[in-house]
């Protein structure tokens, strides 16, 4: 009986230690972002999004899926926060839409080099087009989406 009780105590202690270690090493959720726009224009190293929305969507991946709507203002303010900020390590993004000129789908891989700046009717980013992307000097799109991949472990909904 004494051995059985000792075993149970040791097992419970081990489980408790594993749980507390797991909590200490658990990383913050990595949030990805989506901005929708009525129109988009990619011209040189600038991306202009025309949108009525003052918010963007945020979500996490499996296994603990979460989602939220956050203001562009709060997201912009967080651009240079943390040791691994977007300012220090610009995020990859994909711009998806339909080319206004020929109605063909367009997918352009970019890097967002700056926080968005509010302009008449929307927002403007400084961007860098990635290798293999459509390098036309000007691309105009109708309804568009920009998916922003967050590799940062410091930019989180919890910190906004």
PLM regions and their residue ranges:
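Bacterial N-terminal signal peptides that target proteins for export
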Residues: 1-8
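Bacterial N-terminal signal peptides
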Residues: 8-16
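C-terminal motif of bacterial Sec signal peptides marking the signal peptidase cleavage site
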Residues: 18-20
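C-terminal partner/receptor-binding element of secreted or periplasmic proteins
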Residues: 30-37, 42, 119-160
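Exposed beta-strand and adjacent loop surfaces of beta-rich binding modules
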Residues: 90-94, 109, 143-145
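Short beta-strand-centered aromatic/proline hotspots
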Residues: 106-115
